[in-house]
């Protein structure tokens, strides 16, 4: 599939519009448009569009193609820490993480098999979207709006436990919004475009698996009664 981009038509007396630019695009790619620029495609497709007050600088390609750009390679971390993880960094906050930086919106394309349970703080954090592009059977997302309760294990009663985490099955084409403060954990093999606004702010991924583990231990929960816990975060806090 091809995309063609050009500046909007000029009014009389204005300089002529620049020549159109074109690029192949596919699932997982990001297209950056300048203010006043229009885009056309040679085939139907679904797009998720963000209008931002600022645009990435010219060092960022106007079409970012994670499976074709030699500067973008698998970088384990975040929600996919396995050494063989598929994790492509399209737009990110820090230059040491990926080649293209932007403090307005970040995009990582990730296959999530088993992430740690975490949230992003309301102050100094970020909002997150999962645009689901492929799933394995059984892929799901655990979420919780009771993050503050989980962070106080001594206050949790046995009857509170069933309401602490919710399990959401995922399907290709889903768009999941995870506002600041909502805890979440991906499981089972979901390939998602993970989009954050304003971006992956350092230190704003706060793990809570050690709190979930503490609740299980304190209440003597085991088997199906126990809260699901990511092993790496069970015994010590994770902050990324």
Where are these regions (language model features)?
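Short, flexible, glycine/charge-rich loop motifs used to bind or transfer phosphoryl groups or to couple energy/partner
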Residues: 21, 119-120, 166
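Extracellular structured ligand-interaction cores
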Residues: 28, 47, 102-104, 126, ...
């Amino acid at each position: 599939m091809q995309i063609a981009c050009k500046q909007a038509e000029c009014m009389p007396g204005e300089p002529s519009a620049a020549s159109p630019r074109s690029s192949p695009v596919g699932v997982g790619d990001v297209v950056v448009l300048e203010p006043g620029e229009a885009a056309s495609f040679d085939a139907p497709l679904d797009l998720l569009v963000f209008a931002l007050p600022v645009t990435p600088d010219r060092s960022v390609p106007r079409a970012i193609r994670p499976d074709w750009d030699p500067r973008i390679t698998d970088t384990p971390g975040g929600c996919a820490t396995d050494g063989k993880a598929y994790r492509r960094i399209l737009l990110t906050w820090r230059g040491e993480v990926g080649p293209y930086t932007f403090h307005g919106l970040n995009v990582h394309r990730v296959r999530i098999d088993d992430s740690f349970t975490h949230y992003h703080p309301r102050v100094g954090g970020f909002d997150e979207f999962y645009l689901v592009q492929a799933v394995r059977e059984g892929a799901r997302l655990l979420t919780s709006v009771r993050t503050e309760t989980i962070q106080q294990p001594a206050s949790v009663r046995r009857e509170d436990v069933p309401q602490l985490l919710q399990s959401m099955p995922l399907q290709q084409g889903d768009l999941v919004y995870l506002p600041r403060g909502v805890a979440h954990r991906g499981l089972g093999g979901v390939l998602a475009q993970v989009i954050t606004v304003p971006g992956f702010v350092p230190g704003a991924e706060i793990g809570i698996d050690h709190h979930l583990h503490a609740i299980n231990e304190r209440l003597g929960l085991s088997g199906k009664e126990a809260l699901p816990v990511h092993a790496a975060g069970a015994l010590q806090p994770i902050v990324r």
